Amino acid sequence: RTLLALHQPGNPVILPTVWDAWSARLAVDAGFAALTVGSHPVADSVGKPDGEGMSFDDLLARVAQITAAVDVPISVDVESGYALSGDQIVDGLLGVGAVGLNIEDTVHSEGKRLRTSAEHAELVGALRRAADASGVHVVVNARTDLFLRQDGDESDRVDRAIARLTEAAGAGADVL
């Protein structure tokens, strides 16, 4: 619950992005109370492309090195979930000491299509149920990529993004 407690309305938490034990130690030494492992820098650091260019197991290996090096809560960008179940994602993250995750609605393994709102909420719900079943409050951050894409009409993009994130919150996301 430490990571969740850092998320306070009106007082946003700043999570610096780290990619290895060295960058994590630098961030903690600078005074940050929690960290996030970014998909792009961690993939770049091992010569792989962002967008699930490295496997989930490879990501977990890097996260394990980071959590072994620092004693602060770690959240991990799991991109679109590597086509895994909520249980597999949560079990993997908890197994290496992470207590938060970021899940996006672009499905990299399926031609970078955008999940429907219902699909994204279903995945968020599966992640929440898996976390709750573990007994650890994993902080679930749901993200939409609507503003990074040219999907749909520009005139209602903000409304569609709000609707997508509202549905994700209803499914159990802690952070949007």
What does each model-identified segment do?
Residues R1-L176:
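Alpha/beta enzyme core
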